[in-house]
């Protein structure tokens, strides 16, 4: 969060915080502490996908930093892609590699996030992310051992025709 706040101040960014309907404590009370391990798809939907869907309902376009070399699913993506709900997804870095990213950082003197130096080149939520080991892919620390490679934001894992935000709305709200 310190890095985010530094960038926000340095570049005068308008950062919007998205949160699920319930706090972590409310989430644990409803689903239990083990949901991230027992049903990571449901956990990702409640804590990440659903809040993004609510925010994106107000948008015409979404710019994302996904790359083809990250997952098999992303390899099939297009730079400009209309999603089922009419949202235009723009992926300007889709054909970039790690070397392209590194060169861009050096050329433009961009600040570096501290987590890749701690072996976290790809970060998700705390229960489902671990540091990578030597020789592993950048995303190997995400959902390790679960056979999962995507949270659902960049897939049709959650069909909006059959699931709505109300399907998983939490009754508990901690302030």
Where do the protein language model's features map onto the residues?
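Nucleotide-activated chemistry modules centered on ATP-dependent adenylation/adenylyltransferase
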Residues: 1-175
């Amino acid at each position: 969060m310190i890095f985010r706040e530094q960038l926000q101040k340095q570049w005068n960014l308008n950062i919007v915080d998205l949160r699920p309907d319930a706090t972590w404590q409310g989430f644990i009370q409803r689903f239990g502490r083990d949901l991230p391990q027992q049903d990571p798809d449901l956990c990702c939907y409640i804590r990440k996908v659903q809040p993004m869907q609510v925010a994106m309902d107000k948008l015409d376009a979404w710019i994302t930093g996904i790359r083809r070399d990250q997952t098999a699913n992303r390899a099939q993506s297009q730079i400009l892609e209309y999603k089922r709900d009419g949202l235009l997804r723009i992926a300007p870095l889709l054909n970039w590699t790690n070397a392209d990213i590194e060169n861009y950082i050096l050329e433009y003197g961009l600040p570096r996030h501290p987590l890749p130096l701690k072996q976290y080149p790809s970060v998700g939520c705390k229960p489902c992310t671990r540091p990578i080991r030597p020789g592993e892919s950048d995303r190997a620390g995400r959902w390790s051992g679960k056979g999962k490679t995507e949270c659902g934001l960049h897939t049709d894992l959650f069909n909006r025709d059959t699931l709505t935000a109300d399907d998983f709305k939490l009754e508990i709200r901690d302030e």
